[in-house]
Amino acid sequence: MLDIIILVVIGGAFGAMTREFIMLMVPPLTDGFPLDILVANVVACFLLGTVTALYARKIHSRDVHTIIGTGMMGGVSTFSSFAYGSVVLASASMSAFLIAAAYVTVSVVAGYVAVLAGMKFGEKSADILHRYPPMASIIDSGLVTVESRHSVAETIERVAAKAKSMGMNVFTRVDHGAGAKEAGLGLPPTELIIFGNPQNGTVLMQDKRTIGLDLPIRALAWEDGSGKVWLTVNDPAWLAQRHSLGLSSDVAIKAMVTGTGTVTKYAAGD
């Protein structure tokens, strides 16, 4: 909770500065119409719609969404300023009251349209970013590899034992080394195990069926040329990005990240 509060405070500070900048750039009209407040609120609505759409498409993390969406946009657009501007404008005269009513109406309608426009812009941006990912995401294959203190066979046994103790299913094991031997080829010890929680996996496939290509979870224990043993697993968070999972998959992905991390740490450790 404290980390969320800190992120909101930081974002709010930047938002307040952004708001002041906008209000300096857009002074009120001569008739007292608070155009500066209106512009600040509409800009905030557009940006909030954009970051929300990007977050739904897994373009940025929850922390980024908190600091920009909740914190910064909350600092840019405040209801208190909107209400104060309306009251001050309405109290001047009857004609000013009508202007105030128009201001309230325009603010609500413009804010609604700005949010929709921002969400559309965010969706289009997400499509482009998914189509042309940054170089870092191309280089990052989504694999997490840790050194194991055990043999390949024992590492896989420890994966199976820990997964079962956490209520997961162990679906199958594939001994690639044995397969290579049958084919008359040489391959250092290499073994795959497939495990997972059908409940979490089903939630993810209900969101995007293509993630079934990467489910259940796969863990590969393998020995390198120097005799060291490694355990490699898919990063669930990367899988969420790969398949463009939405907000409905958040809880299941977090559970998968925690579960995979726990199993990996146990299997490779003491």
UniProtKB/Swiss-Prot annotation:
Q: Where is the signal peptide?
A: none
An example Pfam family from this entry, by short name, is: DUF302
Q: Which GO terms describe its cellular component?
A: plasma membrane
Is Zinc-finger among the key words of this record? no
GO: which molecular function terms? fluoride channel activity; metal ion binding
Q: Which GO biological process entries does UniProt record here?
A: cellular detoxification of fluoride
Q: Gene symbol? A: fluC1
Q: Mostly located where?
A: membrane
> Which InterPro entries did the record assign?
DUF302 (IPR005180), FluC (IPR003691), TT1751-like_sf (IPR035923)
Q: Under which name does UniProt file this protein?
A: Fluoride-specific ion channel FluC 1
Look up the coiled coil feature and give its residue ranges.
Answer: none
Sum up the protein's function in the record's words.
Fluoride-specific ion channel. Important for reducing fluoride concentration in the cell, thus reducing its toxicity.
Q: Reaction catalysed? A: fluoride(in) = fluoride(out)
Q: Where in the cell is it found?
A: Cell inner membrane
Family recorded in the similarity comment? Belongs to the fluoride channel Fluc/FEX (TC 1.A.43) family.
Question: Which organism encodes this protein?
Answer: Brucella abortus biovar 1 (strain 9-941)
